[in-house]
Amino acid sequence: MIFPNLEAIEKLSIDEKIAQFGNKRKVKYSRGQYRSNMMLNPLRLKHLNRLDNLEADTVTLNLEDAIAPSRKREALVNIAFFLSHMEASNSFLVVRTNPLNEGGRQEIAFLNDFAFDAIRVSKIKTQKEVQEALGLLAKDKELHISMETKEAFNNLQSLRIDERFTTANIGILDLLNSLGLPQSLVQMGNPTIDYILSKFLIDCHSVGLQGTSFMFQEYQNTQAFEAWCKREKMMGFKSKACMGPLQVEIANRIFGVDEAQIERAKHIKEAFETHSREGEHGFMDERYGFIDEPIYKDALLVLKGLE
């Protein structure tokens, strides 16, 4: 926990919190895993107080749709206050802002001096908006977007104009609304949903973006959530939005790399590099059959996920 007790902090006004900002700066996230992305409400101080020790690989502090307009400033100051008193965190920390023209510009400017890892801008539509967000954002932070408009869905590949733009998060319900399609389509095996997820994933990978799959909002239905995670892993996803610790545990388990995969990848890497030094790039291996360069590259991809 960041603070041993919240009793005094809960009594502070917004201005009093600003006056008591600390000067701590957490170190940059370096674990390299992004299996789970848990959304937190910054109006709940108990949740913010645990930012230093959560199981989620990524934690997103949400200033957008879950916060009423009358409380957005309070939520923004809460985020800054806890960040300013935090020395370290197990998680990659993201702040999800409102759209640029609905307060997002001001939120980014306010937060730039605090220590976190990325800003996630909502309702992005155009390359111009991405360019503006990058211009507003401090150079040491990544840019993420919520991919929830038909414009972004149709032009995602053209939006990556800078390496600091690293991640797109698909908001399936908002996207369906933007496309004029009903939310009832979100069912396992629906071909339209499969197409949307597949297109999103391939568009991300083709331009070097990490794609995070959608949030399953029936958070008590862990069986259905696990089924979605397994299907998305089969499709090629490596990251899933989460509501609460139960979903985080499932996502971390399913999107993790198991020991058998790691052992296989290490063996293939060592065997290929040994044969390669002898000028042989295709050979039969006693344990895993035929190994050539594409299989070697896949093994490197598995091992890269452990960095």
Where do the protein language model's features map onto the residues?
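Expand to "…catalyze enediolate/carbanion chemistry for C-C bond making/breaking, isomerization
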Residues: 1-307
